[in-house]
Amino acid sequence: MVVKKIGSEPDSTGAIVTATYMEAIGGSRIVPVLMKNFVKLIEDGHAGKWVTFNNKSKAVYIEIDNKIVGHIVYDHRSDDLFKTAWIILSWVDENYRRRGLYKILHKYFEKVLKETGSTKIASYVSVNNAARLASCESVGMIKHCYRMEKHLEQNDWQ
């Protein structure tokens, strides 16, 4: 597991926000199942025990006063010509929202991506998740495509 501090700056209240990059190496894995577990595992130093979709997961997280208050967990698809970073999970602690923390977190996330050769960021977002859509748009992401669904009723099969 690679863990590296990547910067710090004040949020809108003046609190110092520290950003850290984490990368799974070899058999290590990253992806929290629950947000509180994610925070506890980092704080307890057990990042190597996380589970994930693949062994290429990475994370950028932010802390205030040594408390994790936000994160982005992401990976890259191996068949992607455009070196897209896919956001798997993102979160800011509800007690720290409305302070510009997601923008700070995303800024350091983009810094890491540029340094590692990524050229694009993508995220699946439900059309019903207005807060997530707004946070994506606040950092310059745009709606790109539509997912089509049809829910099948049991009698549709007969």
Give, region by region, the residue ranges found by the protein language model.
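Conserved N-terminal entry element of GNAT/NAT acetyltransferase domains
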Residues: 1-28, 32, 156-158
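Alpha-helical elements of Rossmann-like donor-binding domains used by nucleotide-donor carbohydrate transfer enzymes
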Residues: 16-20, 37, 104, 108, ...
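Acetyl-CoA-dependent GNAT
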Residues: 24-82
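Conserved acetyl-CoA binding element of GNAT-fold acetyltransferases
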Residues: 82-94, 146-149
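Conserved acetyl-CoA-binding loop-helix of GNAT-fold acetyltransferases
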Residues: 92, 98-111, 134, 138
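Conserved active-site alpha-helix within GNAT-family acetyltransferase domains
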Residues: 103, 126-146
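Conserved GNAT acetyl-CoA-binding A-motif
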Residues: 113-125
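Short beta-strand-to-coil "C-cap" segments at the C-terminal boundary of structured domains/repeats
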Residues: 148-156
